[in-house]
Regions:
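Single, function-defining residue in the core of a domain
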Residues: 3-16, 21-202
Length: 202
């Protein structure tokens, strides 16, 4: 699964129930996309102020499933709840993330993988939120030259497979682009919360 959200801007004077910024209104379409068929498994429509990470509290995690998400969803207590449910996550590390290395696996740097490590979070509160090992993979993209740092709780899959899983997250960006282009939700038939949500759903 890939988890992300997209924001749809609205006029504050017409949609005052959906505050976003001081002069703007917006709704957010929080979506869990099943990557096996590019079909949404979960959609939640909120006002523009709801932080993405709060959506993790609404999901029922499927044991054995992978949940791929960006840095906006990094909350160690919530990721630990996902871990305890028997599911796996793949995300990018926020900077700076304080962690100590416990173990380093051998890597083939010619593949772009710079390091593959087991780490423990530093800090009293962080360590309480996620008290087990995390896997940290540093990958250098040879095309862009960018170095990406991934976090996962899966210790079995090869490092390159974890990197490829994160790359598959872009399917949800294509899904959002398709929605905005084809479902014509730039023009709403009503201004109430129910009218907007009904139109998005239909």
């Amino acid at each position: 699964y890939a988890l992300d959200s997209t924001t749809i801007d609205l006029c504050l004077s017409l949609f005052d129930w959906a505050p976003f910024r001081s002069t703007k209104a917006a709704i957010k379409l929080h979506t869990l996309l099943d990557l096996r068929g590019a079909i949404p498994a979960f959609i939640h429509i909120s006002d523009g102020k709801l932080h993405d990470v709060n959506v993790l509290d609404m999901l029922r995690f499927e044991a054995g499933a992978f949940y791929v998400m960006d840095r906006g969803y990094v909350d160690f207590s919530r990721l630990y709840a996902l871990h305890q449910a028997g599911a796996f996550f793949v995300t990018r590390a926020k900077a700076p993330m304080s962690a100590r290395r416990v173990y380093s696996a051998a890597v083939d740097r010619s593949t772009g993988v710079v390091c593959d490590q087991q780490v423990m979070l530093n800090g009293y509160y962080s360590a309480r939120k996620y008290p087990e090992h995390l896997r940290r993979i540093r990958f250098k993209d040879t095309e862009s030259g960018k170095t990406l740092v991934f976090l996962t709780n899966n210790t079995v899959l090869p490092a390159l497979t974890i990197c490829a899983l994160y790359k598959s997250r872009w399917q949800i960006e294509l899904f959002f682009k398709w929605i905005k282009q084809h479902l014509r939700i730039k023009h709403f038939l009503g201004t109430s919360e129910n009218a907007v949500k009904t139109q998005v759903w239909c």
